[in-house]
Every structure is written in C-alpha cells, then in structure tokens.
Design a protein with these regions (language model features):
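Generic N-terminal targeting/processing segments that precede catalytic cores or assembly contacts
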Residues: 1-375
C-alpha cells in the first residue's frame, strides 16, 4: 500500500512530504518530477507568486544513487515567498475556510487556516504524484489532462468528440491547456476581463488515464471501489466541487440502452466500441481508458471583495484580500493528473505487490499471461 502525508504552510519555510510504499529499485527521474512541478506553476491567470517560486524537490531519504530503496521517501520543497508573520485575517472570505477553520480550532482569525488550506500545499502533492507517475510509466500507463471549459467558454463539441491520445500530448502548446484555438482566444479574453473587474473564474477539467489494466479496485466492499477512491482524491483538491466518470451526469436523462457499453470479442480479447462508463464498472477498471471530469469553482479571493463580518468587531465589512490567482483551472488539471497517478499507483502496488520493482513487474506480467488464457 502506498500512502503519503504532507506538511507546511503557504508562507512558511517550505513543504514537507513523506511517501511510503514505493517498491525498491525504481529509477528516480528527478527532471521528470521537477517538470511536473513546473507544469503546475504555469497557466494564464496565475498570481505574481508564480514568478517568485521555482519549485524543485530535495530528497532527504528513500533514494540512493537515483533508485528507490523501499524506505519511506521524504521530500522538501522550499518556499521563497516566506512571511509567516503576515497580518491576521479577521475579515473571512466567503467561499474559503477562514471562518469555519478559525471557529473549529479556536483561532482569533483565519491566518493559520489559510496558510494550510492554501493551494500551495498541492505543490507537494504534485511531487508525490510525479513519483507515482514514474512507477506507472514502467507499466506503460500514462495520464493526461486538458481543459474543456473556463467560465462560459467551452471547447467545441466537434473538437472534443474527435480528441485522440496523440492530441493529449499537445496541451503544452496552449497557455490554458485547451485543444481548441478559437476557444483559447475567448478564454484569454475572459480571464483578462475577470482580472480587470476584480473577479475570478472556474472551469471544467478532464483527466484521462490510458493503458489501464483490467482489475484495479474491487466490487467486494464500498471502500475498495476504484471510482470511490479516485473521487475522494480529486475532491480533496482545493476548489473542486464535483466529479463525474464517463458520460457522468448526462446519463440521468438517457435510457439504459443509450448508456451502457456493449461488449465484443476479437483477436485481442474482450473490448468495447464505446467508453460511456469512463473505464470503471462496479468499482473495477475494465481495461478502457479512465475518463473523469472535475468542476472547479471560481477562486474565493476577490480584488473586489464580497461582504463579510469582522470577527473582532462583529460589524459588516468587506472580505480581506490576499494575493491570489484569477484562474487556476489549468494548474488544477496538473494536480488532478497527479492525484489520479497516486490512486492508480496505489492500486497497482496493492494488486501486484512486491518489495522490489522487479518482483512487482514479474507479478504484473504473470497476471497478463493469465488474462490472455481467458481471451
């Protein structure tokens, strides 16, 4: 089993992560992990802080001579924008955890809350997910994401319906990670407009896991279902308010005959011509791509603040402003990729086990051979 913990505050000295359960002898490609961190920092609509920070990991343990040892991997990412003694937040922001967190932990204001609830913490999650991606790519499993909507602007249905795996490598060409050039222009305009008006924008992310083997997850108990684990991990990303798999919410208005993926058999075994289920049935991966969409709300920190109440005076006032993004949807898509990577890596280790990568690979290959006999 793979598990992790993170620690650190947004304006503290740095972030700390501990990742346990990665088998020994996995090549640690530091450039790959640092590139994942760089991808998270990019995107139109980010705050000035992205020009300050240059996220790179420092490995303290669990790696020797570029290979994992099987011991817990401890990671540090330093903060350059450090100032933990910033002014107290007594004017809580609607939509953020300032008020509820301060009341729960008996703080005078929301400073201690926002320092930890900040999306800055997701930098460490991306580093951890990056290591999980290294494990997955050894089994030819890859994870992609792209943006299908920001604000009211959606990519065209024609382009969306014709996206293939080769297209998914091209999202880096877009500053907002969309595969529709016309939509990209409109999105950039909407982000500029929101910034000018002191407002923020949300959107919809699509994340796709490819070459997923049959049999990850389980139908035997509620807490072992793969889609449940994925939903939990994606919903834990700051600002994410909903998730769907495959056709998702649109299935509510369709007939069963229009929704379920018919099963066929050919030279390569069982297959489906459609993937309306999004690659998971009864909590188990079915061999198709895993396709999920997540909805991100607009960021709650506004330059034109909403009404709130001062926690000291109890008088009506305007919410406090902190340096923040106008739109973080492109960045959130990278976080979502790496959260999916964590879940899938955990499931791979759970199913194919082994203390070393070599042992895990043998178990995986034996499983594929067994499946071939059933084809």
């Amino acid at each position: 089993m793979i598990r992790y913990l993170t620690a650190g505050e947004s304006h503290g000295k740095g972030l700390l992560g501990i990742l346990e359960g990665i088998p020994s002898n996995l090549y640690m490609d530091m450039d790959f992990v640092n590139n994942e961190l760089s991808r998270r920092q990019k995107g139109y609509g980010r705050s000035e802080r992205m020009a300050i920070e240059k996220d790179e990991i420092i490995i303290l343990s669990g790696v020797n001579k570029d290979y994992t040892t099987g011991n817990p991997i401890s990671i540090i990412i330093g903060n350059k924008g450090t100032n933990i003694d910033l002014v107290e937040v007594t004017k809580p922001r609607p939509g953020h955890g300032d008020l509820a967190g301060a009341l729960k932990y008996n703080h005078k204001g929301g400073r201690n809350v926002l320092e930890r609830a900040s999306a800055r913490e997701t930098a460490m999650r991306v580093a951890i997910g990056g290591i999980c991606k290294l494990l997955l790519r050894e089994f030819n499993i890859h994870i992609f994401s792209h943006i299908i909507q920001i604000g009211n602007i959606k990519i065209s249905e024609k382009i969306y319906n014709n996206i293939n795996k080769e297209d998914l490598w091209k999202t880096k060409r877009s500053i907002v990670r969309v595969l529709d050039k016309d939509a990209e222009k409109k999105i950039l305009y909407e982000i500029d407009k929101a910034k000018e008006e002191g407002d923020t924008l949300g959107g919809i992310i699509e994340v796709i896991g490819t070459n997923i083997p049959v049999g990850l997850g389980s139908y035997t108990n509620w807490d072992r279902k793969l889609d449940g684990k994925i939903a939990f991990s994606i919903m834990s990303i700051p600002g994410i308010k909903g998730i769907e798999f495959g056709l998702g919410f649109s299935t509510a208005s369709k007939l069963g005959s229009q929704v379920h993926d018919e099963i066929y058999h050919g030279k390569k075994g069982y297959y489906r011509k459609t993937n309306n289920a999004g690659g998971i049935e009864a909590g188990v991966s079915n061999g198709e791509d895993i396709v999920i969409r997540a909805i991100m709300k607009p960021i709650p920190t506004l330059k034109k603040p909403l009404k709130t109440v001062d926690m000291e005076t109890k008088e009506e006032t305007s919410a406090q402003f902190e340096r923040s993004d106008v739109c973080a949807v492109p960045s959130a898509s990278i976080v979502a990729e790496n959260m999916l990577a964590y879940v899938l890596a955990n499931e791979m280790v759970a199913k194919f086990g082994g203390d070393s990568f070599e042992e895990m690979k043998i178990n995986f290959d034996n499983y594929l051979e067994r499946l071939k006999k059933r084809w």
